[in-house]
Amino acid sequence: LALVALSLPAFAQDQTPTTLKGVLLEQLRTTHNQKDWFVPANTAVEGLTSQQASWKDGSGNHSIGQLTNHLIFWNLQSLAKFKGEQPAKFSGNNDETFNSFDAKQWNASVQQLDSVLTEWEKVVEAADDAKLQAWASTIAHIGAHNAYHVGQIIYIRKQQGWWDPEKGVK
């Protein structure tokens, strides 16, 4: 135990200092398109048909398409606020963020999810430290929210036999 304790300071000195920007970017990227601790959003929705994206279990749970649209909505809302823009009108009914899914627009939804997640990475990369300090909690929650719903998407895919385990985290 003493040997481990003595080696920690040396190990810590070899590490590049972590910055807030670095942590936030890592979280955004690993919930978008870089596999790390969990499957990212792009992998989760990759290769699904509109019919698969529309499937619901009949118990009130959301479809993959609905989950995707919910992610798009909340990422766009927060992104607009971060950029100082007016976010889309919102009635306050969170159910509406799920129920707007249109199966005919599935491929466009997949592209829009990728686009908004890419834009988040760009604006965080360009932001100064003061802006990131003010927004750190919100951005961290966005990453956690994205990971939560991506987990639901993976669960549905596994449940329905639409998941390739080779795409998972090893």
Question: What is the predicted function of each stretch?
Answer:
Residues 25-38, 42-45, 52-95, 130-170:
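Short, contiguous alpha-helical
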